[in-house]
């Protein structure tokens, strides 16, 4: 009877260990999906709207600068006109329009960023060197609001995540 009880205890311990491993793998998968944009996310953040006007048009470099500023300020997820921005996202000027994730976007450009709204808004609102002040001074139309509930959709583009063909894990 003691041997049987010991076996049952051993099996239960292995089962518990497997459940813990499964939970850990599930959490890591969930985190990875968030990082690569495969799931929609919601949280506090900011919404920045840039619009073309008669004097100045918004160009791809404006959007790239804004995305970089938001990333530096700790944005965890970003989208422009509902195009999820990933590490491999390109923002390209083509004639009179902008391509993001191979999709054409037009003004107004609504940039959503999830992260600490105080950090995000402070980084963009710095006097003299902040994105908003700098762009307004040169005549571009830029507005920002802090939001408690920003929703950013999952990436739904055709592009696959980058496949590593040459970079290998170091042994």
Roles of regions detected by a PLM:
Residues 121-122, 131-171:
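Extracytoplasmic/luminal low-complexity segments enriched in Pro/Gly and acidic/polar residues
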Residues 1-49:
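Juxtamembrane "stalk/linker" segments
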Residues 2-17, 65-69, 142-154:
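Charged, low-complexity, helix/coiled-coil-prone segments
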Residues 1, 7, 49-52, 159-170:
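Structural signature of extracellular appendage/secretion-system components
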Residues 23-34, 82-85, 161, 171:
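Phosphate-binding glycine-rich loops and adjacent basic patches that engage nucleotide phosphates
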Residues 40-42, 104-105, 146:
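Short flexible coil/turn linkers enriched for glycine and charged/polar residues
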Residues 52-142:
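Soluble extracytoplasmic domains of inner/organellar membrane proteins
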